Curated annotation (Swiss-Prot):
Domain of life: Bacteria
EC main group: lyase
GO biological process terms, semicolon-separated: quorum sensing
UniProt-recorded Gene Ontology molecular function terms: iron ion binding; S-ribosylhomocysteine lyase activity
Function: Involved in the synthesis of autoinducer 2 (AI-2) which is secreted by bacteria and is used to communicate both the cell density and the metabolic potential of the environment. The regulation of gene expression in response to changes in cell density is called quorum sensing. Catalyzes the transformation of S-ribosylhomocysteine (RHC) to homocysteine (HC) and 4,5-dihydroxy-2,3-pentadione (DPD).
Natural source organism: Vibrio parahaemolyticus serotype O3:K6 (strain RIMD 2210633)
Needed cofactors: Fe cation
Keywords assigned: Autoinducer synthesis, Iron, Lyase, Metal-binding, Quorum sensing
Protein name, entry field: S-ribosylhomocysteine lyase
Subunit structure: Homodimer.
Length: 172
């Protein structure tokens, strides 16, 4: 099985909250797709609550689009990581890590402005696969934590696992 890019970086050295360019690729028509690792918590040290990350999934995707989409950037998708330490964001364009960090912080401010659970978009059984698993309070606590900590940048070259270690860790 091929080694995915996200598994070539040392998760024990990742800062959080932090933005990282996880991957860039060119489409056949020449557009650049950039995938960002939006790391909310330090891997293997903390985890986002189920209800909190699920509610953020509903709120964050819209808020990030409001703050980052423009003439040269269009967000394709923002999805929570299975490890529940953050989100992956795929987009067309090449915004800087600082632009992404600024949009992230502005989005967290927006999360704090949501007044009640019934203001969460698509929170119903028709548009959400687990409509009962939400907590605006938990999502707002996550947002407060991000705003208090600020958002830094993780660089791939600083986190790259040595080839020898990748070979040693490989499961055949």
């Amino acid at each position: 099985m091929p080694l995915l890019d996200s598994f070539t970086v040392d998760h024990t050295r990742m800062n959080a909250p932090a933005v990282r360019v996880a991957k860039t690729m060119q489409t056949p028509k020449g557009d650049t797709i950039t995938v960002f690792d939006l790391r909310f918590t330090a891997p293997n040290k903390d985890i986002l609550s189920e209800k909190g990350i699920h509610t953020l999934e509903h709120l964050y995707a819209g808020f990030m689009r409001n703050h980052l989409n423009g003439d040269s950037v269009e967000i394709i998708d923002i999805s929570p990581m299975g490890c529940r330490t953050g989100f992956y964001m795929s987009l067309i364009g090449t915004p800087s890590e600082q632009q992404v960090a600024d949009a992230w912080l502005a989005s967290m401010e927006d999360v704090l402005k949501v007044e009640s659970q019934n203001k969460i978009p698509e929170l119903n059984e028709y548009q959400c696969g687990t409509a009962a698993m939400h907590s605006l309070e938990e999502a707002q606590q996550i947002a407060k934590n991000i705003l208090a900590a600020g958002v830094s940048v993780n660089k791939n070259d600083e986190l790259a696992l040595p080839e020898s270690m990748l070979k040693e860790l490989r499961v055949d």
